[in-house]
């Protein structure tokens, strides 16, 4: 006789619904300024769990069967697919306040399309200068599609914070912006969004923003990307498969609502690319390290076989 299916406790932390006045204020500020700081989304316990899981990924470069960070530039260590790491990362993405504010700003067809973070290293270089985030095919766009990012600091950020020019959103198609173009903006329109660990904010990515300069101490932060998946993507992001379907951890997906499942893209293959392979070739060192690793495995196998042969010879005596 078959036993009843095992039931598991709910995993998704469902906070109380936010007061409507809070939602209204956040939506109004986001529409007016392009950016809004959200009231506390998570507990200190949740934050510690997220920090610990994130720090483990930052201990080493990703290699073979070792999980870790990716590094494609000098000043950042990238952690992809953070929804795999800890329950808190999922809870933040699906927080009732986040969902309500974004749905009123973007409409009801939005999804979470990307969830990653990085450790920014100290530098005085303005390596990630003023820009709006390019993501859609501007040749097909009749207007400026809206996209919102949720940012959360995992460390106290006293320098190198997100800088944002209030009211610069939905004015032009996103592009790199030169420093000389910024001088015409009043200083009180340029905000430096410093804050303690756990600070969360939403911003329209078409607005002009950058990572602040200088970065005096390491900064850990996560960034979630929400937009309508039906908007045609720019070719660069298709080639890189940037907006692939989310990678999720089944342990963190208990008690999801239908809306949560839609936001996480359950069953949506719009931007799925079968048998995707990146067109660029890996660097020379990639093949070199792979060859060295293969040689080490063969040497280990040889040592085991020699040891086994010696044991047999010893027993024979």
Model-derived features: where do they sit?
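Non-heme Fe(II)/2-oxoglutarate
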Residues: 2, 207-208, 212-317
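Non-heme Fe(II)-dependent double-stranded beta-helix
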Residues: 2-32, 39-137
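Short, solvent-exposed loop/turn segments at secondary-structure junctions
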Residues: 42-44, 117-120, 135, 157-159, ...
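A structural signal for short, well-ordered beta-strand segments
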Residues: 115-117, 150-152, 222-226
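Catalytic core of non-heme Fe(II) oxygenases with the double-stranded beta-helix
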Residues: 126-192, 233-238
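A conserved mid-domain beta-alpha-beta active-site/ligand-binding segment of alpha/beta enzyme cores
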Residues: 182-197, 250-252, 257
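Conserved metal-binding segment of the jelly-roll/cupin
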Residues: 194-209
